[in-house]
Regions:
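N-terminal secretory/targeting leader peptides
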Residues: 1-159
Length: 159
């Protein structure tokens, strides 16, 4: 039983991997792991550590199944009021920030992983993700059919 929020895509992924998706609120996750209501959960590494989940679930699997993204948004009206130089400066700052944040995030994540390993947490890397991806192909297909071009662009960016 793997903890999920009430999300059909996540439920499909969990089912594809052969687990039983179980809806548990985040606030109840620690006790749900502690009492066996669920056997596991998916969490960002920093959340896993900061919420003391290693105390009740001491195995961390690094499968890379999600990618967090944060966007800066601006209305067409506001963007149109900017000069071309201002627009270019914003785009350049965004690119610089993206690179800086990627480096910062990787450094912070590696630090947390080192701390977890030092404290006795069993950290398992999944070097061959292809079987995991194949197991989730059904839910991927079901949820990208109307956006196949965008999905392919994302895959191409990753490669």
């Amino acid at each position: 039983k793997l903890r999920v929020s009430n999300d059909p895509v996540m439920n499909g992924m969990v089912e594809g991997l052969g687990a039983n998706p179980t809806v548990v609120s985040f606030g109840e996750l620690y006790s749900a792991l502690q009492t066996g209501v669920v056997d596991g959960a998916e969490q960002p590494i920093a959340n896993y550590k900061s919420n003391a989940f290693p105390e009740v679930a001491n195995n961390l699997i690094l499968d890379g199944h999600t990618l967090g993204a944060v966007q800066a948004v601006i209305t067409d009206n506001a963007w149109g009021k900017l000069t071309e130089n201002q627009q270019a400066a914003i785009m350049e700052a965004g690119a610089d920030t993206q690179a800086f944040n990627a480096d910062l995030s990787e450094t912070a994540e590696n630090k947390v992983l080192d701390e977890l390993k030092s404290s006795g947490c069993n950290v398992v890397d999944v070097p061959d993700k292809a079987p995991w991806q194949e197991a989730c192909q059904k839910v991927i297909s079901e949820n990208t059919s109307d956006q196949a071009e965008l999905y392919q662009q994302l895959l191409d960016m990753k490669a």
